Amino acid sequence: MSESTNNPNEKTYKINLVKGTKKWNIAKFSNKIDLSSFSKPVRMYKFNPIANMINNESNNFGQPTTSTYTNNHYSYKNIQPTMTSAPNGTNSTGTTPNTTTTTTTTTTTTTTTTTAAGTPGAPNPAAATQPFVRKKRYEAKPVNPKTIPWKLEDSEGNNTYQGNVEGNQASSNYFLFMFQSDGSIKAVPCNDWYNFRPKKEFQSLTTEEAEDFMKKKNQEWDVFTSRLQKKTDPSGSGSGGSESSGKKSIEELEEAEHRNRNEDPNRYKTTNEEKKKKKAPARRREREDEGNGEDGDAPDFESKFDDDDDDTYMDGDGLTGEDENQIEEDEEEEDVDLTEGGLEMKKMIKKQQQQNDSEDDLADDDDKKDNNGGTGGGDDEDDDEDDEDPDQDDLSNLPKVFGKSNADGTTNSSVKKEDDGGKDSKSSKKSKKKDKDSSPKSKEKKSKKNKSDSSVDNRESKKIKKEPSSPQAVQPNSPSQQQQQQQQNIDPNDPPFTEEYIKIVLQKSKKVKSLDLINIFKGPLKNPDNKPIFLAMVHNVARVVEENGVKYLIPK
């Protein structure tokens, strides 16, 4: 031992590395043990793979072998018969004694074949008695002896441990430090490190022993649970008596119910309610059987489904009173979800539809009067011409809408550029048509067409009731509408009732509620005729956006 010159509080020790031929191994036990408590002699051994290989080879040849382990080294006693050839053709067997070192005896077998004079090349009968040996086509994989666990046990078998090698020893080194009397350290390199853990041995039991063992376990568990119940019971009397009394009371109640049922004289009679319950499923079965008779599998052409097309091809309105009531109920349900502005818009659309219906009715009445007061006449050729031309004439009489084509296939701009001669030709056509319309047959056909058109309009109006957000497109910039606006905007305080002003309001505010926009144009909207115009202008300029459950109008 020598003190360090750098720091007086530190001590330095000299380490002397021992270089020798001895190999030291370290055994580490997982728990504290006392080797003196082991019953002697103590035995430590491991499985020998080499001996197993030799046993397998010897078994193939029918040769027994034994192996023993002494002084941490392997030694084998191989009992192998040696075959020596005798001069008279007979074989004799013998054994070689074991020596202190591992010895391996080699055996040589010779067979003599004798041939008779009359049978050259005859087989030897002794060769048939020898066992057939199959040649090995592969070799066993080499086994690392370090990976084979050690087994440590005493003579009585009370202490048994199994030791496995520690980790990957190819990348680690172990040293044993031994302090010497002169203050130096002797470092001894260690070969292997083994961790020893106690080996658990499971006791095998028969079926009867296992049943007895489980009964004892159940009894112990019952005792344990009863003690816990006594501790948890506040009265301290224990829960066993209460449980037994509860079980007895339940059993008594069940017995009383059985007695009442058995003693009841009407137990086999059925009541009216039970009869009704039994008859109900029988009636259902009868109805199902009747429905599945001759026409039970026939398709139902009258039933309607959600994905069916509209009844536009049917004569008349195509809707019954029940259908109209159902539509009204649906409208009432939709009204609950609409805001105040939406309800006002819906009312305006309904008024416009009613006006259109009233105008159609007046036109029908006029046609009837003309039919009653008109004179007979007209040829079949005129009727045929009337059937061919009405579509074109109707299209030519439609109001001029921007971007739409006329019956001739020309746009409004092209119509304006036509010569006066074209206008004169159109006027002559109209005069001819009036002459044809004066005949009673043509009037009857027109009345029928007007009725069919009114029925289609009614259907469309009922569809519009379901979809209030899609009003009829009315162009506000027509000359008649502009004249109405000029007449209505007499009050100087009211804002101009134009599409441009609505666009300016939307651009300034960016998003407006429908009620706020209606309040701005409150004066012009007092006139009911302005409401559909206002709807059309808003539809052309703005679109609806929903934010956080609130609907706003924003410019397009």
UniProtKB/Swiss-Prot annotation:
- Indicate whether Transcription regulation appears among the record's keywords: yes
Q: Where in the cell is it found?
A: Nucleus
Low complexity bias locations? 84-128, 469-492
Chain segments carrying region Disordered: 82-128, 226-499
Bias-annotated ranges (Acidic residues) = 291-338, 378-394
Task: Give GO cellular component annotations, separated by semicolons.
Answer: transcription factor TFIIF complex
- Report any one BP term from Gene Ontology: positive regulation of transcription by RNA polymerase II
The molecular function GO annotations come to: DNA binding; RNA polymerase II general transcription initiation factor activity; TFIIF-class transcription factor complex binding
Q: Which InterPro entries match?
A: TFIIF-alpha, TFIIF_interaction
**Which key words tag this protein in UniProt?**
DNA-binding, Nucleus, Transcription, Transcription regulation
* Superkingdom assignment: Eukaryota
Q: Where is the composition biased (Basic and acidic residues)?
A: 245-275, 415-427, 450-461
Pfam families for the chain: TFIIF_alpha
Could you tell me which SUPFAM superfamilies the record lists for this protein? Rap30/74 interaction domains (SSF50916)
Where mainly located? nucleus
- Oligomer and partners: Heterodimer of an alpha and a beta subunit.
Q: What does this protein do?
A: TFIIF is a general transcription initiation factor that binds to RNA polymerase II and helps to recruit it to the initiation complex in collaboration with TFIIB. It promotes transcription elongation.
Q: Which family does it belong to?
A: Belongs to the TFIIF alpha subunit family.
Q: Which PANTHER family match?
A: GENERAL TRANSCRIPTION FACTOR IIF SUBUNIT 1, TFIIF-ALPHA
Protein known as: General transcription factor IIF subunit 1
* Species assigned in the record: Dictyostelium discoideum
Q: What is the lineage of its organism?
A: Eukaryota, Amoebozoa, Evosea, Eumycetozoa, Dictyostelia
